[in-house]
Regions:
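Active-site histidine-anchored catalytic micro-motif
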Residues: 1-140
Length: 140
């Protein structure tokens, strides 16, 4: 069985946005008991990450690290038509991930105790992002 589901996420600018609950809901609705959930973001300046969900400082530290690694307004970037955060957002998205594959076991995503799925917005302004969930597996 293969099921697809679209997930829309409105961001308020740069940062991480938890989407684990929405993915879990799609898995439950699919009826798949054993399989995989592939998550793909349809954008080049946002990404998907699997990160610790208990301590928000982990995500803040990640943002601080990426800000040092790929600063906004770097004069070496030529692609600046949409502002000083545009090209750095593309680089950050490439350095993180645009897709994740999660195992489904017993009708749920088999995540670790402290794992959560996050949409990581790399632009400084709000955006509407689309994530395609493709669920494949055996129904219960």
């Amino acid at each position: 069985m293969i099921v697809q589901h679209n997930l829309s996420v409105s961001t308020r600018g740069r940062g991480t946005y938890g989407i684990t609950a929405e993915i879990e809901q799609a898995v439950r609705r699919s009826g798949i008991r054993t399989g995989i959930c592939h998550c793909f973001i349809q954008h080049t300046s946002a990404s998907l990450i699997l990160c610790e969900n208990a301590d928000p400082m982990v995500r803040r530290d990640l943002e601080s690290f990426l800000a040092r690694l790929v600063p906004d307004g770097d004069r070496l970037f030529e692609h600046t038509d949409e502002g000083p955060d545009d090209m750095p957002a593309h680089v950050r998205a490439i350095l993180t991930k645009m897709d994740l594959t999660l195992p489904i076991r017993d009708g749920r995503c088999a995540l670790g105790t402290w794992q959560g799925v996050y949409l990581y917005e790399h632009r400084t302004h709000p955006h509407h992002r689309q994530v395609i969930l493709t669920l494949m597996g055996e129904p219960g």
